[in-house]
């Protein structure tokens, strides 16, 4: 039922149904706040130095929680890094992945009853490439030097 629901919200992209697993990656806009268990882990790792942890919490509150834009950027960037890690791990195990951003983000948010602090970032289809299927040829990619400057 969830796969069918996602299929429609992914604009009927066949890979949603064809892949054995499709993940919806959701970012937590409040993942930086005091409720994150990472602060307890940090306290242990710094030998119980509460002052150091409090300083890190204050920095996080400013850097990631001082505006709606910063909260959204925090959630999206961390979830994007997680997505890349998932795809790299999948590749290591011989599993193919296909990230998808052509989604009805608001529809997914409602259909899967996400909270106000959660934001849909992307979906990833995971499975095995069907060698009998013809794919579109890969389009040319721009070179690093064409899109980036080292400063």
Give the ranges of each region predicted by the language model.
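Acidic, surface-exposed loops and disordered segments
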Residues: 1-151
């Amino acid at each position: 039922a969830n796969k069918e629901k996602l299929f429609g919200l992914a604009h009927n992209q066949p890979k949603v149904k064809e892949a054995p697993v499709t993940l919806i990656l959701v970012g937590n806009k409040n993942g930086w706040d005091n409720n994150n268990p990472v602060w307890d882990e940090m306290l242990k790792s710094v030998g119980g130095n509460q002052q150091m942890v409090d300083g890190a919490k204050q920095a996080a509150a400013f850097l990631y929680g001082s505006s709606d834009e910063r909260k959204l950027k925090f959630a999206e960037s961390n979830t994007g890094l997680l997505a890349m890690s998932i795809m790299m791990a999948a590749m290591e195990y011989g599993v193919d992945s296909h990230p998808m951003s052509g989604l009805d983000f608001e529809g997914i948010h409602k259909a899967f009853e996400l909270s106000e602090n959660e934001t849909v970032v992307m979906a990833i289809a995971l499975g095995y490439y069907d060698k009998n299927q013809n794919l579109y040829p890969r389009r040319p990619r721009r070179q690093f030097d064409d899109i980036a400057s080292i400063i």
